[in-house]
């Protein structure tokens, strides 16, 4: 994780942003119910009060994931809020629900639409709070690498395929430890056909790419810093927060998936940041005589 200032004021801002998120999560639940939309159903026996308390206690993780990105994202307050909200919504809300739709019985027919609406308010509120609490330290975006049109095409293709490749590799690495529980349908889990898994991850990757491109284009720091901060953010938004609160899942499954998602988040982030933000060889060669 990127270095974080050890100051009480920083901690207070993180906690406050987390409380804003938690408050709007509760409000969004009322809104979705009032609209008559379906919500995700927890497995039988799940302690909803324990889940709610864990969600509240874990809420500071979410601004802690976005703040390192926010401080190197130049632009107006509203623009920064918009791009952070889009990134958080796709990573934390939409793509997570798509994954839950195929790997569990909790997101039933109609619930995907309801949950997609549910996450709009809290993600927007979180982004506004983080953008306000953590102003940009970068005045302007770092220049994009100079590449030909064909160079950008294959790098965008690589950025699209990077997520499914990382996902499938690390999923395969831990499959022998978890697959039996999915086959047995433990606590609402399900195991879809491999064709469904691959097609879903290709679609999710397009959503990830669309949501992260504004951050990549506007990034005001070096590409390696982008990679580390994106990896940390995805780990929290996609896995860590949700698995901390998923008390209905077996503890060993939660731990294994936490490590798996952390590994593929950082691997994907480094591949994406390298593909889209690393300096071109031509630019590096041109800079060598000046350095000499």
Predicted regions and their residues:
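Juxtamembrane/disordered regions of integral membrane proteins
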Residues: 2-292
């Amino acid at each position: 994780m990127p270095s974080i200032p050890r100051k009480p004021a920083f901690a207070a801002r993180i906690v406050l942003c987390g409380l804003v998120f938690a408050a709007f999560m509760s409000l969004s639940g009322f809104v979705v119910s009032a609209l008559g939309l379906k919500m995700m159903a927890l497995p039988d026996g799940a302690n909803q009060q324990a889940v709610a308390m864990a969600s509240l206690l874990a809420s500071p993780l979410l601004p802690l994931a976005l703040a390192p990105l926010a401080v190197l994202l130049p632009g107006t307050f509203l623009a920064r809020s918009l791009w952070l909200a889009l990134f958080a919504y796709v990573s934390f809300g939409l793509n997570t629900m798509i994954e839950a739709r195929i790997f569990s019985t909790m997101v039933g027919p109609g619930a995907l639409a309801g949950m997609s609406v549910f996450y709009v308010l809290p993600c927007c509120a979180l982004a506004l709070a983080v953008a306000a609490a953590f102003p940009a330290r970068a005045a302007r975006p770092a220049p994009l690498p100079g590449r030909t049109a064909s160079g950008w095409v294959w790098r965008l293709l690589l950025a699209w395929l990077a997520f499914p490749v990382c996902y499938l590799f690390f999923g395969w690495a831990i499959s022998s430890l978890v697959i039996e529980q999915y086959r047995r349908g433990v606590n609402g889990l399900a195991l879809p056909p491999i064709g469904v898994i691959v097609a879903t991850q290709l679609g999710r990757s397009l959503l990830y790419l669309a949501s992260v491109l504004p951050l990549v284009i506007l990034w005001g720091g070096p590409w390696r810093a982008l990679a580390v901060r994106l990896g940390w953010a995805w780990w929290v938004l996609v896995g860590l927060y949700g698995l901390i609160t998923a008390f209905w899942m077996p503890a060993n499954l939660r731990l294994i998936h936490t490590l798996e998602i952390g590994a593929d988040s950082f691997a994907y982030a480094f591949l994406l940041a390298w593909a889209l933000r690393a300096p071109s060889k031509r630019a590096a060669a041109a800079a060598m005589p000046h350095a000499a």
